[in-house]
């Protein structure tokens, strides 16, 4: 099969766009800042399509299943995996920040820190308790969930709709076929939007460098380096071990989603590739039901990069302000973050809000220390988003294997590059709905 010219590869186009964005932002900062609408516009286009894509994917997956008990089993296995791996991420961040000590020697007095920037950044949002978080999953109305684009609310509606459609049996064939056609149209729209990915990546990167400057990285470079190193360690050591135990390579997996990772790098948003990740995980052999449940849910419960960031940032603040922490206090911090990290999605300024709430709950760490990392948070968000994206992708394959809903032959064929299906098109739907109806 003849390969497309290099310049037509989305991977090459996005990479070139990021480089051009960095150059423009560095040498012409005002022009770089002016490119912000390009990045914002691309992310809004993607967010526009996320809710209906999730709805169609989950409904078709559940309605087409013969054994409905598998849906509950898959959901339970997914939550178990999320809890184990996100806990590992918190522990990895805690251990490495203690070993590398990026904040040691800064000797900053918390009383001298200007906290106005923190108030401005975290003011619009607030942390919610566990009960309120769970109640917020139930939308005011079905229309409201889609209007707000709340992923968990849309997921709840999709699961209920899928179960109801399944119970209709043959009477639901017309609705099933209609949703299938809508799904195909939606993925065609996704393919069209993704052609603008280089423009979005260029705009977002030009703005970031133009506004904050490459020089702003140098002052807190040790923390940046430690965080990126920890994320790499987590991906290739922790997730690498998990993938090896489940029969595939994390290196090949990362290579398989390289285009999506470049888009995430350019936009600093893991949501920007959610529709493509749904499609690509299906193309790897994971069943639609598993992918439709695991990927969207992972955006709230499996934020590995965010978990690493939370422990590292908290201990960094303690080190920088010479605030001593005993082993018991670090264990307490870990326990608090196990709870608060689950509310890190869907909130404006979520990283700082969750971190501020956690520092307040622990009690002995200065919340004012958040101002130390505010300036470089935008650069750290890229590593968070990349780690979150890879983590959720791996989760969908692992949970699919646990649920016996994974075509392993297809998985290895795709990862070894033996097939060249377009990721922008959804995997052909199985004939389970048809066979179930005729039975």
Swiss-Prot record:
Signal sequence residues: none
Location of this chain's protein in the cell: Cell inner membrane
Protein's UniProt keywords contain Glycoprotein: no
Keywords, sorted A to Z: Cell inner membrane, Cell membrane, Membrane, Symport, Transmembrane, Transmembrane helix, Transport
Membrane topology, as annotated: Multi-pass membrane protein
Main location group: membrane
One cellular component (GO) term of this entry: plasma membrane
Molecular function GO labels: fumarate transmembrane transporter activity; malate:proton symporter activity; succinate transmembrane transporter activity
Region (Disordered): 415-439
Transmembrane segments: 10-30, 45-65, 77-97, 145-165, 185-205, 223-243, 290-310, 332-352, 353-373
Presence of the UniProt keyword Transmembrane in the record: yes
GO biological process, one term: L-aspartate transmembrane transport
Source superkingdom: Bacteria
InterPro entries according to UniProt: C4_dicarb_transport, Na-dicarboxylate_symporter, Na-dicarboxylate_symporter_CS, Na:dicarbo_symporter_sf
Function as written in the Swiss-Prot or TrEMBL entry: Responsible for the transport of dicarboxylates such as succinate, fumarate, and malate from the periplasm across the membrane.
Family: Belongs to the dicarboxylate/amino acid:cation symporter (DAACS) (TC 2.A.23) family.
PANTHER family registered for this protein in UniProt: AEROBIC C4-DICARBOXYLATE TRANSPORT PROTEIN (PTHR42865:SF1), PROTON/GLUTAMATE-ASPARTATE SYMPORTER (PTHR42865)
Listed name of the protein: C4-dicarboxylate transport protein
Lineage, broadest ranks: Bacteria, Pseudomonadati, Pseudomonadota, Betaproteobacteria, Burkholderiales
